[in-house]
């Protein structure tokens, strides 16, 4: 009887461990050279690369049309975009669309915006303007550690800032999905 129970327990354990070892095989890496369809698609692909237990409380999009628990499109005509995503007002003409994902409890913990550039706008120049805006911001209610700015296919610029506990996994997931994106800025926030 003991041998039978031991065999059943061993079999149950093997089956349980096998089931727990399964991982989603869904492809989340963007094909090399392919330009994403939208700013929102970029953030959705990165967020999809997170395991459920890694995700944190986020809100996406503009405050007039928020998306709970996921990235969302940000209306670039919404006057709050300069406050929420720190894009300088003089840079608004350089973007045609935006998407965002912000930590629900404190934007300084994690904020990310992806901006589609208007035709002829340099990703490096836009990135420099965003770097100056974020580095020059007067912070309240917490202080972000890191600023990350990436150029995606010369058509999009991702700007993310936050505490290292949020930024390190975000950069890992972003790089897994968009390995060909060029890093324009990756620096501590002064």
Regions found by a protein language model. Give the residues of each.
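Post-signal peptide N-terminal segment of mature Sec-exported envelope proteins
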Residues: 27-50
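Surface-exposed, low-hydrophobicity interaction/linker segments
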Residues: 47, 51-103, 122-140
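A short acidic-to-branched-hydrophobic micro-motif
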Residues: 109-119
């Amino acid at each position: 009887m003991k041998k039978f129970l031991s065999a059943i327990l061993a079999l149950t354990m093997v089956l349980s461990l096998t089931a727990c070892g399964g991982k989603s095989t869904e492809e989340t890496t963007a094909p090399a050279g392919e330009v994403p369809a939208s700013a929102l698609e970029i953030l959705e692909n990165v967020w999809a690369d997170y395991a459920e237990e890694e995700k944190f409380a986020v809100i996406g999009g503009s405050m007039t049309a928020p998306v709970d628990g996921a990235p969302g499109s940000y209306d670039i005509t919404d006057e709050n975009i300069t406050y929420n995503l720190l894009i300088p007002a003089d840079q608004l003409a350089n973007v045609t669309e935006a998407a965002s994902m912000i930590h629900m409890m404190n934007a300084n913990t994690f904020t990310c915006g992806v901006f589609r550039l208007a035709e002829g706008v340099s990703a490096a120049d836009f990135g420099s303007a965003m770097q100056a805006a974020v580095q020059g911001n007067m912070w309240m209610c917490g202080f972000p550690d890191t600023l990350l700015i990436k150029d995606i296919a010369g058509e999009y610029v991702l700007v993310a800032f936050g505490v290292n506990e949020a930024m390190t996994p975000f950069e890992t997931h972003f790089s897994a999905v968009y390995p060909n994106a060029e890093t324009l800025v990756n620096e501590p926030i002064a």
